Amino acid sequence: MQITILGSGVIGVTTAYYLAKLGHEVTVVDREEGPALETSFANAGQVSPGYASPWAAPGIPFKAAKWLFQKHAPLVLRPTCDPVQYSWLLQMLANCTDSRYKVNKTRMVRVAEYARDCLVDLRKETGIEYDQRMQGTLQLFREQYQLDGIGKDIEVLRQDGVPFEVLDREGCAKVEPALARVKDKFVGGLRLPHDETGDCFKFTNALAKIAEGLGVKFRFGVNIKSLLMSGGKVSGVETSEGVLTADRYVVALGSYTPALVKSLGLNAPIYPVKGYSITAPIVDEDRAPVSTVLDESYKIAITRLGDRIRVGGMAEVSGFTTDLPAARRATLDLSVTDLFPGGDLKAATFWSGLRPMTPDSTPIIGATRYDNVFINAGHGTLGWTMSCGSGKLLADLISGNKPDIRADDLGISRYE
């Protein structure tokens, strides 16, 4: 079949790769001048299935209210005049119950674990390089109450068979030696030894080249305007370079997915949650991380990417703005300087991206009520983690193959 994929982030490119492997003729369309130049460009860098947890969780409403008054809050809410923002927030609050949290986390871990396995297989098949490290990730707790409160997460990890280690200060310093100098800054950690790290931008660009070798065509610098309907199905995509037609269409536009599919009467409750990152060259190896360390207090990930440190995180609900406030940079600087002062922050680059978040934190992967339209979007903070699994899963669904994991609860139908 001829398949057009809208979006060349890590989700769009992985989907293209797996569809091409199954023999389809694939074209990827994007407004940017190359792959992974928006949300996939400078994310935190971890591939962390075990940390696949919903933002909508019990206690979050109370925490969010408290964070409103903190200088270095991990969550910032900036109200807009957009009613979609309020609708999305209300749906998110409805998912902040124990029962919904368990359902959503189980779905997320299922996709994320599968995606990690797909990434391992892809790496073996292609030899792809992207500053990857397979040395686990460490969630670091500065306060005892944080460490005491991981019971629900551990319960789900056990149920899903995800290996983990609860570490004291000495254990944390053993896996991340630079922490030995700052043991007074934390009380313990939760380590997931099977998690990985890597540069999502490098991966996406390398995979795009591999996909081109399989026949995938990329059309960059093309603005996507609308989906055209005829005879009860989509007949084409109106773009700045004319109408593009195919047998099947995949919408992988992240936060911009809802606007495109709204004309089809589809409700995709994906809203942008802005994240920030800085990337600094390493100047002191002894004070740099080995892998990824998640600073639980600030919701920030500090990751080793080759000879660089990537510091990313936080969440800002403020619409589609991509500005770079100095206060957000200050929070990133504070976290990394406190724990891993091995990077040259004066030479760091500062970036922001719009994470496409659903109210239940679970991505939308699968068919729509239109036979020839599919969605692969809404991965939130886990687009990199879930990318390979999401791409392979959707490629199988489009091709009529039985998927390797359960997929019936991942589609857009759960919102209709």
UniProtKB/Swiss-Prot annotation:
Protein task: Oxidative deamination of D-amino acids.
Reaction equations catalysed: a D-alpha-amino acid + A + H2O = a 2-oxocarboxylate + AH2 + NH4(+)
A Gene Ontology biological process term: D-alanine catabolic process
Chain positions recorded as FAD binding sites: 3-17
EC numbers: 1.4.99.-
Family: Belongs to the DadA oxidoreductase family.
Keywords: FAD, Flavoprotein, Oxidoreductase
Pathway(s) served: Amino-acid degradation; D-alanine degradation; NH(3) and pyruvate from D-alanine: step 1/1
UniProt superkingdom: Bacteria
Cofactor(s) needed for function: FAD
Gene Ontology molecular functions: D-amino-acid dehydrogenase activity
Designated name of the protein: D-amino acid dehydrogenase
GO-annotated cellular components: cytoplasm; plasma membrane
Pfam families in the record: DAO
SUPFAM superfamilies per record: FAD-linked reductases, C-terminal domain, FAD/NAD(P)-binding domain
Species in which this protein is naturally found: Brucella anthropi (strain ATCC 49188 / DSM 6882 / CCUG 24695 / JCM 21032 / LMG 3331 / NBRC 15819 / NCTC 12168 / Alc 37)
Underlying gene: dadA
